[in-house]
Amino acid sequence: MGYPGAMRRSALLFLSFFPVLAACSNGTTDESAPPPSPRPWQRLATPTSAAMAEVRGLRPVRGILHSHSPYSHDACDGDGVQPGGGINVGCAQDLRRSVCDAAEDFVFLTDHADHMAEYDFESLLFIEAGDEPVKDAGGAVIANRIGCGDGRTVLITAGNENSLMSVGLERHVPGTAAERRAIYEGDDAATVEAMRAAGALVMIPHTEQRSLEYLAATSFDGMEIYNLHAAIDPDIRRDSLGLDSYAAAASILPFTKFDPEGPEPDLTLLGFFEDLPAYAERWDSILPVRHVTGIAGTDVHQNTFPSMMRDGERGDSYRRLMRWFSNIVLLGGELTPGALKEALKAGRSYVAFEILGVPVGFDFHAEQGGSTIEMGGRATAGGTLVARAPVVLDPDPAATPPAITMRLYRVTAGKTETAAEGLSVDLTDAAPGAYRVEVRITPHHLRPYLGYDADRYIRDSLWVISNPIYVD
């Protein structure tokens, strides 16, 4: 869905008015020595390969679902497509640079039918010299590996987001540009069939705006269990989340000030990050009935806060928003479009709000009869569910450690209950139900970067949300 014009303008109008080196220890125990200084804020994300280890032969890769490019009519401050049909080159370069700076391994672009339906498929992949186009068995280009210049690449796929979201298209749906647009903007079984026939997974964006009846009646592979746009858009907050329209926007203001003693701009999410029960309520209503993968949608457009922050970057930059959270997918082999979609459809993934700290060591699986069942899999009653809470990657010894908690939830028809809790869980003789894990964190370690009002932002928050394991 993205920003309807009025919604986007209301948020933009509101926001537009507001326009240390680490000390080295000498190894002594002199009590008069000053405490060590915290590390400088790290603007660039740590590559996944350096942050997360394999588990049982499964390699974690991080990425973005639900991202817009210049081919969306409202992206790039509404200036993505230029007169004459060219695209906003500066915005396209922002996107290419940001996926590398945010250390993503993959990005599923999901543009609005207006204008992505009008362009040939390869154009949607932003292929440039030095990239590695990905081809299918017949030689057609289906994806692109953007080169980061340091040996890393980021896998880019095309897709669309309107009422439904096609994730990982391998070609356009058939027809003329007008016919394609009509399909991409559809919301019925024929739309789902056409998207899947073009190689895509079908997911529900903006779940907060869908009724339980709609979700129960619609065929899809996954659904958003968090959407960043919804969390801050005044109209969606009021109409779909039951929240104060402008409270989130107001909470951003301290991060926009050019005050070196103020909070770090990259931590702006902490100003308005809160539990949004509408997502869990809808997801949990579906899980007892059928398998549905939960994903987090960044929904970045680079179109809401063009003013520069004190780090010299616009407030809603691709890099900044992409750093806030990722979908972590567990792969058994090479990172390919097909492998990614297979793992996502299976539910072998989890959501991590990495701006609170990169989670290292998270694990959730089932053990039964000598076999291991991964997230998204099915076990029979009587097996053991195993969950291990993560720790923060490379903690700063000068900072106060975070407080971490973990709960294992059992979801049955009309009921979500705590089945176990603790940093290490082994639940034996698991009863039937859909089981999912939530890890929460109180980010004391971020205090050095939150300025003079740090207590306002250091609060118990969602950190990791697993996909379910189903026990029959």
Give residue spans per PLM region.
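A metal-dependent hydrolase metal-coordination microenvironment
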Residues: 38-248, 260, 264, 273-281, ...
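Bacterial signal peptide processing site
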Residues: 25-28
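Sec-dependent signal peptide recognition
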Residues: 8-15
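Acidic/polar low-complexity surface segments
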Residues: 251-255
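C-terminal functional module detector
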Residues: 30-60, 64, 68, 72, ...
